[in-house]
Amino acid sequence: MSETVFEPTDHPHRRYNPLIDQWVLVSPHRAKRPWQGQQEKLSEEQKPSHDPNCYLCPRNKRITGEPNPDYHKPYVFKNDFSALLENTPAPEQSDDPLFQMGQARGESRVICFSPDHSKTLPLLTALEIEEVIKVWQAQLRELGQKYQWVQIFENKGAAMGCSNPHPHGQIWANSFLPNEVSREDVAQRNYYEKHGSVLLVDYVQKELEKKERIVVETEHWVAVVPYWAVWPFETLLLPKVHVKRLTELTEAQAKDLAVILKKLATKYDNLFETSFPYSMGFHAAPFNGEDNEHWQLHAHFYPPLLRSATVRKFMVGYEMLGESQRDLTAEQAAERLRALSEVHYKER
């Protein structure tokens, strides 16, 4: 009897994520199983450019009763229901190692990407996305003077818990380093001390050589389905050279970031011809007074959809109790995304 030869597209295996020192279980054969579970509701109704009932549109009143200005570019305001507060006092320290508290000071802000209620990121022009990037950079410069971590992110779509359909993102600044970022900080620092080079700079060079997980590439940036991806069509957006923060981008790199963000978001929408839900955000060197040479700027895109516009991946059971698990391989996901048009399906 001949021995079975391992095939990554057929056989279960584990992949290591050096960025957070964790493993993911890959089970490609499970993609063939029938699905009779929950399906998401499609919401493809035509949205107006201005919704009089939307509390993020220009000139409308927000939930607090305060009116929005008649803004024409990206607009930032303090989150009306902030998760973090500026003047939070420090809790009393406990001697009991099982019951510890830490101080959590910070600020939460909202950024409306444009005044147009109907235009998500892929439907904006590259020039309009450039304006969003400029605001991100300005917010980082301001908040980075007061807080060691500033998290820029977007939850797109009801499937990701987005409470308002007007295209917007969030900016949370805090006095502490969050768990995910701390894991990345430790892993990148350890790699730098051991190898004398930057983990994600080495990684991006190898991905550019291999090409099999590249989704879209521009002059200064590349988006890949990372080798260790957890979510079905997860991507990692990376500059091709060492850059620690968004605020350190050259003008050419910033312009090119707008281009690749539009291309990547368009491919996502084109996959199932729907407004593709995801959570995305940037990770970069903290503002903690250290040189942070081990850090590399990058953005994570975590989309939940798996088989169609209505069937999503659920992180439950084994994923919550054991370790993350995915069905299709990173290479299969990249191949599907790479083959998609960079022209949005609504604009063909």
Q: Where is each model-derived feature located?
A:
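A contiguous, surface-exposed recognition patch within enzymatic or periplasmic domains that forms
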Residues: 244-253, 257-262
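Acidic/histidine-rich, metal-coordinating catalytic segments
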Residues: 280-284
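Active-site microenvironments that recognize anionic phosphate/pyrophosphate groups
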Residues: 1-166, 172-244, 252, 266, ...
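Extended C-terminal subregions enriched in glycine
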Residues: 256-275, 279
